[in-house]
């Protein structure tokens, strides 16, 4: 399995979201996963928190994220917190 880190988003000092491309059994995937610092090591380890998608789902994902962003900035959307 090949793996190529493409982008990372810092969350906290000891955590980040890593976005990478992976090849597995001849198929390409986009993996978005939270990584954390291993204790007493200079190493980041993957957590169970993440998402792995086939490459053909990237465009629908981007479309959905765009709609979420538009909804957040739209005046007709009211976000409620659970009581």
Specify the residue positions occupied by each region the protein language model found.
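Beta-strand-rich receptor-binding modules of extracellular spikes/adhesins
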Residues: 44-60
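A short, structured beta-strand/loop element
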Residues: 17-49
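Mixed-charge, Lys/Arg-enriched low-complexity segments
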Residues: 55-83
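Intrinsic disorder/low-complexity signal
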Residues: 12-15, 30, 41, 75, ...
């Amino acid at each position: 399995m090949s793996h190529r880190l493409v982008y990372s988003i810092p969350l906290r000092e000891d955590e980040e979201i890593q976005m990478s491309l992976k090849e597995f059994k001849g198929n390409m995937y986009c993996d978005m996963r939270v990584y954390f610092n291993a204790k007493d090591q200079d190493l980041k380890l993957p957590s169970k928190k993440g998402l792995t998608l086939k490459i053909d789902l990237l465009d629908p994902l981007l479309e959905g994220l765009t709609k979420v962003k538009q909804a957040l900035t739209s005046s007709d959307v009211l976000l409620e917190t659970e009581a």
